[in-house]
Amino acid sequence: MLANMKSFLQAIINVSEKAANIARACRREVQLFRLLVQEKSNEEKNQRFVQDFKTLADVLIQETVKHELGSKFPELIGFIQGEESNVFTNTLGETIEVKIMASQEDTAELLSKVLDGDRSAADLLALEVHRDVIIDSDIPQELNDTNNLLPMDTIGIWIDPIDSTAEYIQGTECSPDSHDIYVCGLRCVTVLIGAYNRKSGEPMIGVVNQPFFLENGDSWRGTFYWGVSCEGTVRNSFSAPPSPTSTVVLSGSETDALKENLAKHFELVEAAGAGYKLLSVARGLADIYILSRGSTFRHL
């Protein structure tokens, strides 16, 4: 089956925003936030939860993306993957597979089992999962042309539901540096959804959603970016190509020797989140993202 490139991209953007809504809800709603902040060391966290709530937030976003895209594009079922296992064991020893049910009520019922009967938290999560989300996007009309059709039986999806989880949990606030790059905090958190050719591994479409882009009183507003490079079409949501900045963005865990060598030629900015660092390069805030360790990988 062939799918319209514009409608496929719009579907990914919509579900990225639903994922962002879930991420924001987990920090905004008191009942959910109490669970979220329990992610500490094994000794400190509430032993009532066998798997921490942070992991459930990750998994719920991942399964929501899988459900939404699989429902709209059945050819993708079985080829939408993420980094989290969706199997949980509650304190009663029950093994539960987290998945999105047909109704909000059924999803809440399943989630309450994972959360050891905390129905209030389960209801709040299920509400966001089943909420209709359609976000305005400035996708060029040319992606709606009949020559921009995608063979869905060749496409795979990879999801990183909450990138920079530590910053998401801690929820600290940082000021941007002179290049407008945030080195830590909620602004480094991203939801990453990518479509790729599952035969060659070549990336085709990517969406990066920043759930915590702009603080607005007691709430947050997000933003998103997209890019397309497939079937001879190359487009993205950036208004202009980036200009050189002589800046390298990297993780603070890189070796001192590497940093010393780079500092001879570039200004270094240590920032959280692999997705956020890549986004900083795409936005032209930095020239290069350097990663010398095996903590981040390309999925094939």
Predicted regions and their residues:
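An extended, acidic
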Residues: 3-6, 12, 19, 212-215, ...
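Short amphipathic alpha-helical segments and helix-helix/interface helices
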Residues: 66, 70, 145-147, 192-193, ...
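DPxDG-like acidic metal-binding loop motif
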Residues: 148-228
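Conserved residues at the C-terminal ends of beta-strands
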Residues: 83, 209, 292
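Short loop/turn segments at secondary-structure transitions that flank enzyme active sites
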Residues: 29, 86-88, 165, 197, ...
